[in-house]
């Protein structure tokens, strides 16, 4: 039985490696937006400091180590409407307590409708504006003098992203460790893709009312495989945060001071994407 499982794993690894080598693979920075914009108003306002937050079923999305600090009856639903209704997103988060180790599940959806497709509206007939004459500028893919755009050829398509985030956490000595597996189904017009990734988190309480958190998103380099054979890969992002709660003796209010530091390994420029393949 062990030999059988070992053989199956070797075969699957070989097929996966072969499919990767036979397709175009890109290092990119965009593609998992539904995970970056998800959250409720409270936790999104914390920015990177959200890695120190805990107590709700949305918190593990920012730091998986908070998965064991969610109330058993905690259920979150969030709806976002952005860019005058063009972008709509939903999030549902809840704790699963039926296992020996706590699990937290978050389901996400983001959709954009009525995206104009203008790829085929150029009447690329050249300077004379007459098709088939072979004059200068004909079929060069540029809008030249004498050419025009046909608005009747504008088509519209939609984009849909559906994702899940399943996390757990465990304590060892003075640290809490967290691990999350996430998946994404991305539909863009007539194209579709599926991706997987892993997040890792740490949470510590080094002093009274103080918290330090660390999250490594896409620690295994996440993948997004399109039905065309193109593979998009995403580099890890490191986010660290620190927070302290001040209890005001003369007032029932509390004051939270927070700070964060982010290191995005994908870089900052728009033209530094790398490509390898055949």
Indicate where each model-derived feature is located.
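Bacterial Sec-dependent N-terminal signal peptides
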Residues: 1-25
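Subset of outer-membrane beta-barrel
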Residues: 24-278
């Amino acid at each position: 039985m062990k030999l059988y499982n070992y053989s199956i794993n070797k075969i699957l690894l070989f097929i996966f490696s072969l499919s990767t080598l036979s397709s175009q693979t890109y290092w990119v920075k965009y593609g998992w937006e539904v995970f970056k914009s998800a959250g409720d108003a409270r936790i999104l306002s914390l920015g990177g400091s959200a890695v120190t937050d805990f107590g709700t079923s949305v918190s593990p999305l920012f730091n998986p180590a908070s998965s064991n600090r969610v109330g058993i009856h905690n259920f979150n639903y969030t709806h976002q409407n952005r860019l005058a209704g063009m972008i709509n997103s939903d999030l549902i988060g809840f704790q699963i307590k039926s296992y020996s180790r706590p699990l937290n599940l978050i389901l996400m959806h983001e959709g954009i409708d009525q995206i104009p497709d203008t790829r085929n509206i150029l009447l690329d007939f050249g300077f004379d504006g007459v098709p088939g004459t072979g004059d200068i500028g004909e079929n060069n893919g540029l809008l030249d003098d004498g050419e025009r755009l046909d608005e009747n050829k504008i088509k519209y398509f939609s984009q849909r992203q559906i994702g899940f985030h399943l996390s757990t956490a465990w304590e060892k000595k003075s640290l809490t460790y967290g691990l999350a597996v996430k998946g994404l189904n991305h539909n863009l017009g007539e194209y579709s893709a599926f991706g997987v990734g892993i997040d890792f988190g740490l949470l510590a309480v080094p002093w009274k009312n103080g918290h330090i958190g660390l999250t490594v998103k896409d620690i295994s380099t996440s993948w997004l495989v399109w039905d065309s054979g193109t593979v998009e890969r995403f580099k890890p992002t490191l986010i660290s945060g620190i927070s302290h709660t001040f209890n005001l003796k003369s007032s029932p209010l509390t004051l939270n001071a927070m700070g964060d530091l982010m290191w995005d390994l994908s870089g900052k420029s728009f033209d530094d994407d790398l490509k390898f393949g055949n």
